[in-house]
Amino acid sequence: MDKLKCPSFFKCREKEKVSASSENFHVGENDENQDRGNWSKKSDYLLSMIGYAVGLGNVWRFPYLTYSNGGGAFLIPYAIMLALAGLPLFFLECSLGQFASLGPVSVWRILPLFQGVGITMVLISIFVTIYYNVIIAYSLYYMFASFQSELPWKNCSSWSDKNCSRSPIVTHCNVSTVNKGIQEIIQMNKSWVDINNFTCINGSEIYQPGQLPSEQYWNKVALQRSSGMNETGVIVWYLALCLLLAWLIVGAALFKGIKSSGKVVYFTALFPYVVLLILLVRGATLEGASKGISYYIGAQSNFTKLKEAEVWKDAATQIFYSLSVAWGGLVALSSYNKFKNNCFSDAIVVCLTNCLTSVFAGFAIFSILGHMAHISGKEVSQVVKSGFDLAFIAYPEALAQLPGGPFWSILFFFMLLTLGLDSQFASIETITTTIQDLFPKVMKKMRVPITLGCCLVLFLLGLVCVTQAGIYWVHLIDHFCAGWGILIAAILELVGIIWIYGGNRFIEDTEMMIGAKRWIFWLWWRACWFVITPILLIAIFIWSLVQFHRPNYGAIPYPDWGVALGWCMIVFCIIWIPIMAIIKIIQAKGNIFQRLISCCRPASNWGPYLEQHRGERYKDMVDPKKEADHEIPTVSGSRKPE
């Protein structure tokens, strides 16, 4: 008699065996790497990388830099710095993560002496992640506030003070008085003139610029900003709720790791382009738009600016930070690629997309600002802003003057939301990837609790940034953590991989993935990796040290303890570089010279993660999947691949 077939609902255990396991649900059946998982599709990876690279800076920093550095002329140093600094580092990090299938800390099995560089990258990413989600919370608040028939910052209201005005305000004027029968003309405060029913003499008025309604709304309503960092105040409850919502969105998108975030980015990475196109089309139809675009990249371009070193420094700095190199995220995201993926073409696509997006965003921004300048009777130079002032003061002010202002405001802030979210996805993935590499068994069983736990801890740490002094904290972290630490990590990354591990050896590793290339293909990359890119990064680092100034927010200086805290944050991030180097040297054997030499050799478990990809060069490497060898081993006796 034939064996009875079991009903389908009895086959759940059998199905689990086929598809990795219920504990390891972030790994798909067809994944090449059944331990860590891979991207479901190539497009998941590309959109995640584009979303990570294209962030808020592309919208609120690049257009202003272009305008202030000669307009269209700025694109020349920008393109040159992309080729000399941005793309070489981007390609290197993508290749590094993909080759070893490891995150930014464990990937330093390539050079155990420099493992602290990876820790520095992750710590800086953590600090930046804390305040970056606060900016997303600001965007959420403004988006919700826009769901009204009239934007709340369109006019001065009960929350504003006497300085709220779109036109200059009279502060003093001359009045005619009679004293003991003698007529006198004296200068008085305008408030005194009004109280005493005097009239200003025509032409005697002294003016000061008024504060736009959008500026007072930002400071008095949205932030409830205190007088300085010394005055913490209370937690602004609606910003705290928006921050919580932002973290809930991030946690929900990452609960299955790259398997879930790789689907969400189809919306978060592509939607900003739709909004930018809509804003550009709308802006181009407005009166004065052509003047704004002319200031941005047209007839106002000043090629004499190319003689100024500041312009080249700004171009290099913008490229370096906008591509998100040396943050650890590129290594983390690339570690989930299949081994034979063409990371070279990916690097080209993402870098070009990032730069073209910056240029495109500038047209959308300046067309609207040109219209704002036109209706207010000002020059474009008087209304253009950068950073927070552009996103939450200048642009909202311009949108408030448009017919259907709430609709355009909702679109704009929803775009900022999506721009921030996919950058945040990659930053959190950097943290969870680091945990996964260090504790793989724990991560398989507890990916969801660990991911949500990270989000919860970072939310709690971010609450200080939604107090009445929150904006000062945001600016402080950005000023210290998102600067020198990243430059130091990038310089040491190049020195370690190219000069110590060996640029030629790294090229051989890369060719195992993308195939052998002719010598002329690598000529450019060798020139950049060995000489040009390190020199540029060192020059930027020295320049930033020379140009360092105490942080301030507007005209408000930071207290001494705030500056000291900023230095403590950056020292905490980079101190792990010497600490880990000392630990590795202590773990090694022999005299100090022998220990140093052994620490500069790859660990015994460095190489392709899967045995099928190791070939002759890595046939003797220790299997990284074995628990005993998962941690970076003592480097004495490390194998040096031929």
From Swiss-Prot:
Q: Which SUPFAM superfamilies match?
A: SNF-like
Q: Name one GO molecular function term.
A: beta-alanine transmembrane transporter activity
Q: Which InterPro entries does this one have?
A: Na/ntran_symport, SNS_sf
| PROSITE patterns reported in the protein's UniProt record | NA_NEUROTRAN_SYMP_1, NA_NEUROTRAN_SYMP_2, NA_NEUROTRAN_SYMP_3
Tell me which parts of the chain lie in the Extracellular compartment: 131-234
* Topological region Cytoplasmic: 1-44, 584-642
Residues bearing carbohydrate: N155, N163, N174, N189, N197, N202, N230, N302
What does the function comment of this entry state?
Amino acid transporter that plays an important role in the absorption of amino acids in the intestinal tract. Mediates the uptake of a broad range of neutral and cationic amino acids (with the exception of proline) in a Na(+)/Cl(-)-dependent manner. Transports non-alpha-amino acids such as beta-alanine with low affinity, and has a higher affinity for dipolar and cationic amino acids such as leucine and lysine. Can also transport carnitine, butirylcarnitine and propionylcarnitine coupled to the transmembrane gradients of Na(+) and Cl(-).
Q: What else is known?
A: Transport inhibited by BCH (2-aminobicyclo-[2.2.1]-heptane-2-carboxylic acid).
Q: What's this protein's name?
A: Sodium- and chloride-dependent neutral and basic amino acid transporter B(0+)
Q: Which species is this record about? A: Homo sapiens
Encoded by which gene? SLC6A14
